[in-house]
Regions:
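Poly-acidic low-complexity segments
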Residues: 1, 50, 143, 202-205, ...
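Zn-dependent metallopeptidase/amidohydrolase metal-coordination segment
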Residues: 167-235
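Midchain, well-structured core segments that form catalytic/ion-binding scaffolds
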Residues: 3-166, 171-177
């Protein structure tokens, strides 16, 4: 796909204009599905093998694992299924995990260790474990030369300003913030060189194939957090 491509630029909306040779977090995703045996939770609990217990043990083991992971590791999860009624021992439960770190090799080893946590949960509860690998992405490989060119052009082209209606809208949005950022920051370009973003992106995979750099532009009200309703309100 990128064989004839000299360079790749990627863009992301933001509350600020920014460019630089910034990296990201590598990530692996996995779903642990446990299958046990249903039973009446009060009438015959000894007959049940709780898939939810297996999820809870997996999560507890993962919490203990955090203490013994390298700096900048991020492990987070959601329980997708945990039973339907408290009077029934859950025969099926599922938990979804993300593992992140600035180094993809570290992520792979953390994934191995997290699978051991799930295996322990299944062993302790006599349930069956299915490991559903959901994919992985590498960290962005920074390219300083491209980043400098992008930042220079972004500064030359940046001529943002708010009209009266836009200013009034921005001020209303900022009333919902705990910390306000001057609206004049839309005229600035932040240098992100040498930093590591807290997110993960498949652009990371691309960056290991072809020279890649990225930038963001001020599409939201200054001070807006990503993945928030304020970001959506900005359109």
């Amino acid at each position: 796909l990128f064989q004839d491509c000299a360079a790749v630029l990627h863009w992301h909306p933001s509350h600020e204009n920014a460019a630089g040779d910034r990296s990201s977090l590598a990530r692996m995703a996995v779903k642990f599905r446990f299958r046990g045996k249903a039973a009446h939770a009060a009438g015959a609990p000894e007959r049940g093998r709780s898939a939810l217990d297996a999820v809870e043990l997996t999560n507890f083991a993962a919490q203990l694992l955090r203490e013994h992971t390298p700096d900048f590791t991020r492990i987070h999860h959601v329980i997708l299924s945990g039973g339907e009624a408290p009077n029934v021992v859950p025969a099926y439960a599922e938990v979804y995990y993300y593992i992140r770190h600035p180094d993809g090799d570290v992520v792979r080893d953390l994934y191995r260790r997290l699978v051991l946590c799930a295996q322990a949960g299944a062993l302790a509860t006599e349930t069956k474990l299915e490991v559903g690998f959901e994919g992985g992405i590498r960290e962005i490989l920074p390219n300083n030369t491209l980043a400098q060119i992008t930042a220079r052009n972004l500064r030359e082209l940046n001529d943002l300003s708010y009209g009266e209606e836009e200013t009034a809208f921005a001020l209303r949005i900022q009333e919902t913030f705990t910390r306000k950022v001057p609206l004049t920051t839309i005229k600035e370009v932040t240098d992100r060189s040498g930093t590591i973003g807290k997110g993960s992106t498949d652009v990371g995979d691309v960056s290991w194939l072809v020279p890649t750099t990225g930038f963001s532009t001020a599409c939201w009200v200054p001070g807006t957090s990503g993945h928030s309703w304020q970001a959506v309100a900005a359109g």
